[in-house]
């Protein structure tokens, strides 16, 4: 059964969980999980909204901790909405089954030639051909998609990446008894790790001192690898810290961040215990400024 999707949407003051099981009957032993989340959370045990049924971090962590199988995470940064559009579209292509699957190597080559030789100029037609190859149940189709993804037309680059991923999952689910789990996020990931963007502010909106900047850089560089996390980017601004890092799928993101923030605050209590985490997109400088200026929780030093 191919499931589309467990979609988590978490906001500052709300938590909603939407599950749809709508596409795919011919892809055995595979699950599609779309995760789109933004949290603003408070370090420690003080925030009531993080309790019981409203503990969105707990729901997020447990949803993956209970999953067993081979995780696939798209490395490219493709909007979740486009990813879900792709899988719904490819489900219809599988259902139509025209030409009948599995496709022969010759059929795959003909489709690929049509993509390359300019006979197809419309974006929708290119999308259709890519989805046909993705659902071909053919190793040759996978190799052709792999080749095309390296030089895809800009208007279908994301679609080609999705087609390549689907083809890989389809083949692995066909030849392996292990469950295949595809995790879709806006920021993507690497291997079996999800990419998160984190915004942390200084306590009381006070500018960081030099020793505090050094402490942040050293503590994060030391602490995060202890949980098998990888820092891709850390930038310490005047009043805020931006972190982009990779986290193992089954790791508790909140626990990891709480621990390193607490360690930093042993040296002067200068990081706010409220921070923002998302796997949708990086925040722009304008969005960061808006958070600093409008969020009441940062207007006091308490």
Predicted regions and their residues:
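Extended repeat-based scaffolds of very large eukaryotic assembly and lipid-transport proteins
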Residues: 50-127
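Amphipathic alpha-helical scaffolding segments comprising HEAT/armadillo-like alpha-solenoid repeats
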Residues: 70-74, 104-116, 138-150, 173-178
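Structural detector for internal amphipathic alpha-helices that build alpha-solenoid repeat scaffolds
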Residues: 85-102, 125-137, 147, 158-170
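Positions within the helices of HEAT/ARM-like alpha-solenoid repeats
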Residues: 121-125, 141, 155-156
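Long, charge-patterned amphipathic interaction tracts in eukaryotic proteins
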Residues: 154-229
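Short, intrinsically disordered low-complexity segments
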Residues: 226-285
């Amino acid at each position: 059964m191919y499931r589309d999707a467990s979609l988590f949407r978490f906001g500052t003051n709300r938590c909603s969980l939407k599950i749809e099981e709508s596409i795919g009957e011919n892809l055995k032993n595979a699950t599609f999980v779309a995760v789109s989340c933004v949290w603003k959370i408070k370090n420690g045990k003080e925030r009531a909204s993080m309790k019981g049924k409203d503990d969105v971090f707990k729901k997020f962590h447990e949803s993956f901790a209970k999953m067993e199988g081979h995780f696939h995470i798209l490395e490219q940064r493709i909007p979740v909405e486009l990813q879900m559009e792709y899988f719904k579209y490819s489900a219809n292509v599988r259902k139509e089954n025209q030409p009948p699957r599995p496709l022969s190597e010759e059929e795959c080559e003909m489709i690929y030639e049509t993509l390359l030789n300019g006979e197809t100029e419309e974006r929708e037609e290119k999308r259709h051909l890519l989805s046909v190859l993705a659902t071909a149940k053919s190793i040759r189709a996978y190799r052709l998609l792999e080749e095309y993804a390296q030089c895809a037309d800009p208007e279908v680059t994301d679609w080609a990446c999705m087609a390549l991923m689907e083809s890989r999952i389809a083949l692995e689910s066909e030849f392996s008894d292990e469950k295949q789990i595809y995790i879709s996020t806006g920021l993507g990931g690497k291997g079996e790790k999800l990419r998160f963007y984190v915004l942390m502010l200084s306590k009381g909106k006070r500018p960081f001192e030099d020793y505090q900047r050094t402490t942040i850089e050293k503590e994060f560089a030391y602490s995060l690898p202890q949980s098998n996390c990888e820092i891709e980017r850390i930038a310490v601004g005047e009043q805020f810290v931006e972190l982009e890092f990779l986290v193992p799928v089954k790791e508790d993101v909140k626990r990891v961040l709480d621990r390193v923030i607490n360690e930093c605050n042993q040296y002067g209590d200068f990081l706010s215990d409220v921070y923002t985490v998302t796997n949708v997109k990086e925040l722009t400088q304008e969005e960061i400024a808006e958070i600093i200026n409008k969020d009441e929780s940062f207007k006091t030093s308490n």
